[in-house]
């Protein structure tokens, strides 16, 4: 099987996993830039990475989207300034990631690697004892 076919299968598996975790079979998907937070009943996943070392980062994004669809609760729309809305969204993203990571333990590493890649940190540092 060619690497291209394997990458397509990984994408399909990620979308199936998102549907299963979120208990939402209606979720549609495409390949492209992820939206944070995602839109309702849709996920956009970046292309599967060519390098195995980047696979956990990629999985972290799909884990986040699954957790968003599982744990995010639609609240009443209330008026917020743009900076306040951005902070509110980031707090909600952190909340669903924490809830998901506590339920699905393997996803914590994936989400950590993805988050660190967003701020361009390649390896988590550990405090010395």
Provide a role label for each language-model segment.
Residues 1-118, 122, 126:
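Basic/hydrophobic alpha-helical interface regions
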């Amino acid at each position: 099987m060619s690497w291209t076919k394997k990458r397509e299968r990984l994408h399909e598996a990620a979308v199936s996993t998102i549907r299963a975790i979120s208990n939402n079979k209606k979720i549609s998907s495409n390949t492209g830039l992820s939206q944070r937070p995602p839109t309702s009943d849709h996920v956009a996943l970046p292309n599967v990475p060519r390098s195995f070392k980047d696979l956990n980062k990629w999985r972290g994004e799909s884990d986040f989207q699954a957790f968003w669809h599982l744990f995010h609760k639609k609240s009443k729309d209330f008026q917020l300034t743009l900076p306040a809305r951005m902070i509110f969204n980031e707090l909600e993203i952190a909340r669903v990631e924490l809830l998901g990571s506590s339920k699905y333990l393997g996803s914590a590493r994936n989400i950590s690697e993805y988050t660190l890649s967003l701020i361009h940190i390649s390896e988590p540092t550990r405090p010395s004892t």
